[in-house]
Amino acid sequence: ASALHNRVALNIAARFLEAARPRGCRVYMSDMKLRIRDEAVYYPDVMVVCGEGPPHPYYEEAPCAVVEVLSPATEALDRREKRAMYLSLDSLQVYLLVDPERRRFTAYRLTPEGFVEEEGEEVDVPCLDLRLTLEDAFRL
């Protein structure tokens, strides 16, 4: 991954961590596995999990927020396969794709009618009671 990719992921994780600690939530970066039933394992760029501790020392299963920072090599996977798998999780409230080249967010946000796709410069992360902005993500 590029330096920009890493910086953006770290900025988002740091912003999430500020909000997560007082809520007893956990924030992970790309070295923690997300296991989706017995079907797949992914390593999201950033993941937030609230509630009880991990089901296993090496993976989580119930994130409320997942972030992928797009890169040319992974964009198709992030937008298709991973999106379908992540949105199948009962715990998920928001799946955020960050495009570092275009500097924009695409969020899949859970509503009573199901997931809604939104593009913009900010996204609400309900489990952290946080609004993440492009400025947060791209701070140098």
Stretches with model-predicted labels:
Residues 1-140:
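Gly/Pro/Ser/Thr-rich low-complexity, intrinsically disordered segments predominantly at protein N-termini
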